[in-house]
Amino acid sequence: MIEHMMTLYSLHRFLTSTACVLCLSLGMLVPAAAQNNKPSANNDAKCPAVLQYTVDRLQDEKPQNLCQYTGQVVLVVNTASFCGFTPQYKSLEELYARYKDKGLVVLGFPSNDFSQEPGNNQKIADFCENTYGVKFPMFSKTTVRGADASPLFKQLTQLTDTAPKWNFYKYLISRDGKQVKSYNSTTDPLDSKFLAELDKQLSAKTP
């Protein structure tokens, strides 16, 4: 009887130890699976350096990685609500609606660097939607020139040797992110020369 009980006890210890080993093994596998959900190094490598920034969206201030626009032609514009060039919002929206299916995205960055965007993000978002029906992506109010400029605008300035001189300055980034051209505030987004350059960039193959 005692030998039978000892046998059962030994069997119980063996099964318990085996179960613990299995649990530990499975526990070690979970983090590895979780890591696979992160963006791979290969995907990151495709994103051009000029887009490797995370910025807050205007409407809800949630972070957004600009790498999601990899392979598109990107037009970056610093905007303001009380500027003589503010009606360019209409042209920018028309441009976006006309070319977004061909690979263009317009990114708007409100700024008070020239003292013509005093409102907070919510007021700016309401103005853009209610006045011009803006649908292209807009981001939180930011600094676009000088020592306090955002990293994105610092790089755009470095790549073109031109910082925004006024509101509605424009930077056109090629699909592969290797070419960046700047356009001053007086260049309307629907200007024929600008559209010619845009068509050229859109016709380039996606990297």
Regions found by a protein language model. Give the residues of each.
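Sec/Tat signal peptide C-region and signal peptidase I cleavage site
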Residues: V30-A33
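N-terminal "domain-start" segment that seeds a small globular fold
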Residues: Q35-C67, P87
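Thiol-/selenol-based redox modules, centered on thioredoxin-like
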Residues: P151-K154, Q158-P207
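Structural microenvironment flanking redox-active thiols in thiol-disulfide oxidoreductases
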Residues: F85-A149
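N-terminal secretory signal peptides that target proteins for export/translocation
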Residues: M1-H12
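Local sequence-structure signature of Cys/Sec-based thiol-disulfide redox active-site neighborhoods
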Residues: T70-L75
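Amphipathic alpha-helical repeat scaffolds
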Residues: N78-F82
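Bacterial N-terminal signal peptides
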Residues: S17-M28
